[in-house]
């Protein structure tokens, strides 16, 4: 999953779950932009994918020509079936008001089911958690594989590969705070050059050994699998490296649109990748020793250093897309109630999606550097790659079935017939990758399991806290009726009480009445909702309900791709007749100090984890962009 990198939100959002036309930006610019952002990950897979697959097929020995043909055929048909058919043809139609990605798909699937929504949420949590594993491994593997090319110039560079990789990664994460808007405009042209170069470089070896073109025949892939038994199954796990990054096609749907992404894949990316894999295959057929690094050995000696430089830039771009994807996913998870509030900084005035999350950036940097130090080579790290991506693809296929059945209104048999072949293939790839758990596959599983535990704990704890608070709090309607009959002393101005439950009297309001024994002239019960759509039209942002001469309810709605700005949203309420002046308004927020209860509904360890997460949450004042000088916080203690 990737996010806003030089991507102008170019589409008029579709509303029918069949994402289509983008009209507000140049089609050519969008297509070029998608090449730079969407295809960075899958575009740098030739650096290691065929090498690892052939080494798996030959069990570390010299690969026979028929085995190389089988591997190349498997890679080509994986690109055709998994990427072209599943993602480019089918899933790009399953948009959530123009947006893609697993959490957007989860929200779309939730709207289609009355029962079983909790299962959909669980699938979304699994998919989102696995992505963080991918976000850690991709930068480490990509940059490491590019820098390793320098060893072909001279073995003397070998000791410097890991230190140089770490330096580049540290620099990459260090510049995140400044945003990528200025350099992102170059991502598309650079990646276009990359695809042209890797495609053209394949012609000489293909012309010398044109028999490699027979690998396009799927019978070579079938024959390889039938005659190699468990080795063929293990090889599938390495073949999958060629399609890692396919999720980005769907994740970046909202940034570029269906047509530009499809055009870039069919006319630039797929032909270049296919040619390069065929070229590498021809090289290894001619010289089995070329398996050491077939990608770089396709180039003449004079081009090695320029290609290492270009590959390094390409892998940095691929890593950048994954990093910003992690930011975007985190914001969506916060808005959907799967994670506590984190500090979110906007790095561009022009693009709302250009964000930076300091806490996520630090965690990713530490994790990525540790991986490089732990595995030390791209071959070792490749064993850890694939499990998180295959897991995400399996979940995507499952939720895609629900959308096709419930949202598109297909019959379950027709929906099953469409998705079943892809789900079977995804499960096969997942099974093959699970064989690599002990070799390094445990890394993304451990990372995913940890994030999954955090998401599940936060969602469950928040639900329990909400239910408990509702039982303890006073009904708002009863309180308003009492205050209208026996009004306390009034003070000038407007008081806004932020609450997650508009039916109950906010804790801050009750404490204000108890301690100050006064009531403002105007009192607003403010609730902030997250809609199951990426964005909300400004005309639908505010709902205003007058419940008494003194009290009114205001509901602000934000999409899960938006960062809530309360003062800006409240300004819209003026059009509804509410006179809002930030300088005469005080915002009352309650800050809860949580303590574990004897019987909370969660295990003791989960209680403590939820409390720790709650304490680490970013301040509501900052998150909702409320001026701190207008905020009054009231502390309360709650057992959970």
Curated annotation (Swiss-Prot):
The chain crosses the membrane at residues 30-50, 71-91, 117-137, 155-175, 183-203, 224-244, 265-285, 294-314, 363-383, 385-405, 410-430, 437-457. Keywords: Cell inner membrane, Cell membrane, Ion transport, Membrane, Potassium, Potassium transport, Symport, Transmembrane, Transmembrane helix, Transport. It is found in: Cell inner membrane. Transport of potassium into the cell. Likely operates as a K(+):H(+) symporter. The gene is kup2. InterPro entries: K+_transporter, K_trans_C, K_trans_N, Kup. One of its GO terms (cellular component) is plasma membrane. Residues 1-20 are annotated as: Disordered. PANTHER family: LOW AFFINITY POTASSIUM TRANSPORT SYSTEM PROTEIN KUP, OSMOTIC STRESS POTASSIUM TRANSPORTER. The keyword Transport applies. This is Probable potassium transport system protein Kup 2. It comes from Bradyrhizobium sp. (strain ORS 278).
